[in-house]
Amino acid sequence: MNIKVAIVGASGYAGGEILRLLLQHPLYLSGQLSIGALMGSSTVGQTVSELMPHLPELSDRVVEPTDVETLKSHDVVFLALPHGFSAEIAQQLPAEITVIDCAADFRLKDQKDWDAYYGGKHAGSWPYGIPEMPGHRDLIASSKRIAVPGCFPTGATLALLPAIAAHIIEPDVSVVSITGVSGAGKKASVAMLGAETMGSLKAYNVAGKHRHTPEISQNLSEYADQKIVVSFTPVLAPLPRGILTTATAKLTSGITLDEIREIYLNAYENEPFVHILPSGQQPQTQAVVGSNMCHIQVDADDNSKKLVVTSAIDNLTKGTAGAAVQCMNLSLGVSETSGLPCGGVAP
């Protein structure tokens, strides 16, 4: 095996995290995978040492302009770009190249959802990159075009999917996700300045306005008898990375907490990157930083008769780059866990 990988948008947070993971991948360490073109736009001509000093193995590599002809000489192409740019590049690449898109361009199936939340030409949808969703692992493994999920939908979907599939909650769910600032990307903005974010929490794009809302609904509705209505509220926190999600929904019956836990334990029994915590222990972002894990806890509110599920992921790893590498592994036919850390970084 001799796999040559390119990254478009290599100097962004997602691109840099993909590089970090590839550098510890067994295929790279054994010489079976090489890191080819590192492409960008605003950082063209700068070295990895300048942009990402935490990756000394690539310190002398230079970011080059995005060029489709150069990409055609690669086996795997990661697109780590803002939405709207991936589709134009992807349509010019040969079908035999594995293209893994970290943007939103190919996530949504419904043209109306795309028009309402993104606008512009809808490029269609690709196999969706959450392998833990029943049926998706095989689709990913057999595909050369894969859409990496959004970070918020990853935490919310994994939190609610077993309950939806078991039909134990009503089709109206509430999701509140607290996120670190790296989710906004590297582009400079006043709202992301330290003076604006440190010591403060702020909700944004509330009341169904966030672009990840239809993606969460799409994922959950796939396993329900009807469309799942999602009320999604993101909250910005003064953290570099991490997402803590609290999802609630009305229980449909008098099911016990022990029975709910059993549903979740069975659903994720064979999933290497999902961990159901012991009773009474709550997920925390620190425990998953730098890892491809999702930590989950389930509970039942006796007062409101609601299911309460909390989940924690690293938005840059399981929420983006880790999912991308996980999908690459499946597409290449190697171990799904290759190069993906399960342990977080603490303190």
UniProtKB/Swiss-Prot annotation:
Q: Which GO terms describe its biological process?
A: L-arginine biosynthetic process
Where are its TM segments located? none
Catalytic positions? C151
Q: Where in the cell is it found?
A: Cytoplasm
Q: What class of enzyme is it?
A: oxidoreductase
Q: Which CDD domains is this protein grouped with? A: AGPR_1_actinobacAGPR_like, AGPR_1_C
Q: Which GO terms describe its cellular component?
A: cytoplasm
Pathway membership: Amino-acid biosynthesis; L-arginine biosynthesis; N(2)-acetyl-L-ornithine from L-glutamate: step 3/4
Q: Which UniProt keywords apply?
A: Amino-acid biosynthesis, Arginine biosynthesis, Cytoplasm, NADP, Oxidoreductase
Keyword Zinc assigned to the entry: answer is no
**PROSITE patterns assigned to the protein according to its UniProt record, in alphabetical order:** ARGC
**E.C. no:** 1.2.1.38
Please list the GO terms describing molecular function: N-acetyl-gamma-glutamyl-phosphate reductase activity; NAD binding; NADP+ binding
Any Pfam family matching the protein: Semialdhyde_dhC_1
Reactions catalysed, semicolon-separated, are: N-acetyl-L-glutamate 5-semialdehyde + phosphate + NADP(+) = N-acetyl-L-glutamyl 5-phosphate + NADPH + H(+)
Q: Which family does it belong to?
A: Belongs to the NAGSA dehydrogenase family. Type 1 subfamily.
Extract the PANTHER family matched here. Answer: N-ACETYL-GAMMA-GLUTAMYL-PHOSPHATE REDUCTASE, CHLOROPLASTIC-RELATED, N-ACETYL-GAMMA-GLUTAMYL-PHOSPHATE REDUCTASE, CHLOROPLASTIC-RELATED-RELATED
Q: What does this protein do?
A: Catalyzes the NADPH-dependent reduction of N-acetyl-5-glutamyl phosphate to yield N-acetyl-L-glutamate 5-semialdehyde.
Q: What is this protein called?
A: N-acetyl-gamma-glutamyl-phosphate reductase
